[in-house]
């Protein structure tokens, strides 16, 4: 804890803190959508009592006060720190490698942002609504800050989903879009071919196009958010932090490797795949940290068909990708792979036995140690996607590969909740491979919870630390 109690350590209005008015994200997440997310009829009064344990931050001159340490300068941590500072809170942001570093979940060049969440088994309505709000915010962030930082942060590419026949994912996505008034087009394969002849879609019965979807600069956006936070008065510290002991209902001061202690009124851990290392007993069996791989292929010399704005981001079964972006033209991005064709066998030939299980390399479950290279068979699988859908790129040179851990919780929802037994310490994250997309609005939501604003109690309930756990004997070897 800090030397003085929370209510006695106000931070006065500071001209360095942004005077932007509070945004309306929480109002958008109303009780109706909260009920959908929670998936059950819950007593709001009970939830409110649970969610407001501990003292909220006292307000002075209409602004919050106190000191918060945010651990993790990834997408969620950066926007949480920025929004806390905009509320008037003193903020210290800590990261062991730096904002947007290559080990982080959002340290890649780009991320797609779309609202097609018909494949979600829970909370699909809310995810669509929040994704639409995120798209608006990314556009506004780009318009406001691109000139200063000398780079675009968001490109409205549109997103096209192609399937050979209707699937629950495509049917439900179209239903959700219709119900929420989302702009989209349902095209025939012939119409798609006329619009994007470089994208082979013959034989597809389902072509859904979301024109407002886009692609964001991931690493650049995280680093820009941290720069804006520092301009507003957030202090940044580089170093590895250890959680403080939990005693008497609160977490005590954090400590760096050199023994230096960092005390505050509240602590917010936005640590992505590092959660199982920081809180092993709490998070080891409540989340998984698979590794996702992507390839960036060179676009042909003198051929702009595979560059923005000439082709949208795209979604085929098991694989997503998008065009090369200006001005660096890092490459045409492919995430996922097609399996090689099965070998031919005689009609009476027995199928081969399944391959023997490969022991899990423990380094793959440690974001500090995990190798991020992509095996050749994975690259070959991504190239098979090009051969089928983008034949002009079938032999394109490989510019680079990227790999990062992402997080999946046992209940497939984000986690925004207090650490058990510590009224002043929070876990915020576990992004379900979608965390960057939502970070620009979730940073505001997390900040509001930390300063004591509950918002919709049903949403708060849905984002609680799950009580279910993964089977500890189940191998944690997911990757894609």
Segments predicted by a language model, with ranges:
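Dinucleotide-binding Rossmann-like beta1-alpha1 core, especially the glycine-rich loop
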Residues: 110-195
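N-terminal Rossmann-like FAD-binding beta1-loop-alpha1 element of flavoenzymes
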Residues: 67-92
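N-terminal secretory signal peptides
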Residues: 1-24, 45-51
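Flavin (FAD/FMN) cofactor-binding and adjacent substrate-gating region
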Residues: 28, 162-232, 237-238, 244-250
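Glycine-rich FAD pyrophosphate-binding loop
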Residues: 86-105
């Amino acid at each position: 804890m800090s030397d003085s109690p929370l209510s006695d350590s106000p931070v006065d209005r500071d001209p360095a803190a942004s005077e932007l008015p509070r945004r309306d994200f929480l109002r958008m997440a109303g009780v109706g959508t909260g009920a959908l997310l929670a998936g059950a009829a819950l007593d709001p009064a009970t939830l409110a009592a649970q969610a407001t344990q501990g003292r909220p931050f006292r307000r002075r001159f209409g602004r919050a006060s106190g000191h918060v340490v945010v651990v993790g300068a990834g997408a969620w941590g950066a926007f949480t720190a920025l929004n806390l500072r905009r509320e008037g809170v003193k903020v210290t942001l800590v990261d062991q490698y730096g904002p947007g570093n290559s080990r982080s979940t959002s340290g890649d060049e780009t991320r797609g942002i779309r609202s097609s969440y018909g494949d979600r088994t829970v909370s699909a309505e809310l995810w669509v609504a929040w994704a639409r709000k995120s798209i608006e915010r990314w556009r506004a962030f780009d318009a406001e800050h691109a000139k200063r930082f000398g780079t675009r942060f968001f490109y409205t590419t549109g997103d096209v989903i192609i399937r050979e026949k209707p699937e629950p994912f495509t049917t439900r996505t179209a239903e959700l879009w219709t119900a929420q008034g989302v702009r989209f087009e349902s095209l025939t394969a012939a119409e798609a071919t006329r619009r994007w002849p470089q994208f082979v879609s013959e034989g597809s019965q389902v072509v859904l196009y979301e024109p407002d979807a886009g692609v964001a600069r991931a690493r650049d956006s995280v680093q820009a958010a941290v720069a804006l936070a520092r301009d507003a008065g957030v202090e940044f510290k580089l170093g590895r932090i250890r959680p403080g002991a939990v005693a008497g209902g609160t977490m005590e001061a954090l400590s760096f490797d050199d023994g230096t202690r960092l005390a505050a009124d509240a602590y917010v851990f936005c640590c992505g795949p590092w959660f199982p290392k920081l809180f092993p007993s709490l998070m080891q069996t409540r989340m998984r940290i698979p590794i996702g791989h992507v390839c960036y292929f060179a676009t042909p010399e003198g051929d702009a068909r595979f560059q923005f704005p000439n082709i949208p981001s795209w979604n085929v079964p098991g694989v997503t990708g998008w065009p090369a972006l200006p001005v660096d033209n890092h490459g045409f991005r492919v995430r996922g792979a097609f399996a090689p064709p099965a070998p031919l066998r005689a009609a009476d030939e027995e199928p081969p036995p399944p391959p023997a299980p490969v022991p899990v390399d423990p380094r793959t479950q440690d974001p500090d140690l995990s190798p991020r290279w992509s095996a050749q068979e994975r690259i070959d699988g991504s190239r098979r996607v090009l051969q089928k859908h983008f034949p002009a790129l079938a032999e394109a040179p490989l510019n680079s590969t990227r790999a990062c851990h992402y997080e999946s919780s046992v209940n497939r929802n984000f986690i925004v909740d207090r650490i058990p037994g510590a009224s002043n310490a929070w876990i915020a994250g576990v992004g379900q491979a979608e965390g960057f997309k939502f970070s620009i609005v979730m940073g505001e939501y997390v900040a509001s919870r930390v300063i004591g604003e509950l918002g919709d109690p049903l949403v708060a309930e849905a984002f609680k630390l799950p009580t279910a756990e993964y089977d500890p004997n189940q191998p944690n070897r997911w990757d894609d």
